[in-house]
């Protein structure tokens, strides 16, 4: 038997004893040595970790692989490297593998309802390997209880806003609407403060452009941001349009975009899954 095979079976045997504290004899080239396997120190069993996290940093999770966390007193040296300013040491962290506008609308509502501030918004290239983004958002506040409340509220609202995300094998569509844009939507999409806000993203990108064109022709609205794979995104396969204006006009634009977007996406061969309940 090869040495590598011997070591493989030896390690398997050691692993079975790793939580027993028993002694075993390990063969050497010149005889044997006797060693005691330290109980619990040799191999970690990740299934010993509960799925119900009790860490103080943990706030919760929700749909779209979203997690909410807090840090009550961020390390000073790390804070200086984060490029978010040094005003706040109590931070809220909100991060998802899939989706952007739904979570950002939830964060926007949460910040408006609490004594917290948006410090940074990033849209990583993710969507678990699909065509779009995930999100990584940092909040700050003077009181960790305010920050925790904002993150908890955003987690709850994400379940609502996930209702306008449509994901199929062929692509995805995302829509959002807010009657009054706040600081998160202003920072991410240059929304007009206090005005109605609308958002649409389509993947493949060609569907997104047709949706954007349909929205602009449907009602009198103002473009606040326009993004493509090479412009404003992390090279996602999307065209993204956000709008501001009168509430009824913005909603009409988004609804018209949704209708044509769904027809085009379904024409590619499969019906989309919806991780929530449509709310528009």
Describe every region a protein language model picked out:
Residues 12-18, 22-28, 32-36, 40:
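Short, positively charged and aromatic/hydrophobic N-terminal segments
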Residues 46-99, 122-134, 142-143, 162-280:
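A structural signal for small-residue-enriched, beta-sheet-centric alpha/beta enzyme cores
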Residues 100-131, 141-146, 157:
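Active-site cofactor/substrate anionic-group-binding motifs, chiefly glycine-
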Residues 103-106, 150, 207-211:
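Amphipathic alpha-helical interface surfaces
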Residues 138:
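Short, conserved beta-strand segments within well-ordered enzyme catalytic domains
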Residues 149-157, 253-259:
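Short amphipathic alpha-helices in soluble, non-transmembrane regions
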């Amino acid at each position: 038997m090869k040495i590598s095979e011997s070591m493989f079976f030896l390690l398997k045997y050691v692993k079975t004893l790793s939580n027993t504290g028993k002694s075993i004899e390990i063969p050497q080239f010149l005889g044997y040595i006797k060693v005691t396997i330290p109980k619990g120190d040799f191999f970690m069993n990740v299934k010993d970790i509960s799925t119900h996290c009790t860490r103080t940093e943990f706030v919760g999770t929700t749909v779209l692989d979203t997690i909410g966390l807090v840090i009550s007193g961020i390390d000073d040296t790390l804070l200086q490297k984060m490029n978010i300013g040094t005003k706040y040491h109590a931070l809220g962290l909100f991060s998802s593998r899939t989706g952007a506008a739904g979570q950002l609308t939830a964060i926007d509502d949460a910040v408006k309802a609490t004594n917290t501030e948006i410090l940074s918004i990033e849209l990583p290239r993710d969507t678990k390997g699909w065509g779009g983004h995930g999100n990584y958002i940092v909040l700050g506040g003077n009181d960790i209880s305010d920050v925790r409340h904002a993150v908890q509220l955003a987690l709850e609202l994400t379940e609502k806003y996930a209702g306008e995300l449509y994901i199929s094998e062929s692509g995805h569509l995302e829509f959002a609407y807010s009657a009054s844009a706040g600081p998160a939507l202003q920072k991410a999409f240059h929304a007009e403060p206090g005005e109605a806000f609308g958002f649409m993203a389509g993947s493949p990108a060609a569907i997104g452009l047709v949706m954007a064109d349909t929205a602009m022709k449907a009602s009198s609205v103002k473009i606040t941001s326009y993004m493509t794979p090479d412009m404003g995104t992390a090279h996602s396969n999307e065209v993204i349009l956000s709008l501001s204006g009168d509430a009824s006009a913005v909603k009409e634009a988004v609804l018209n975009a949704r209708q044509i977007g769904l027809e085009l996406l379904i024409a590619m061969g499969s019906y989309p899954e919806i991780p929530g309940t449509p709310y528009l």
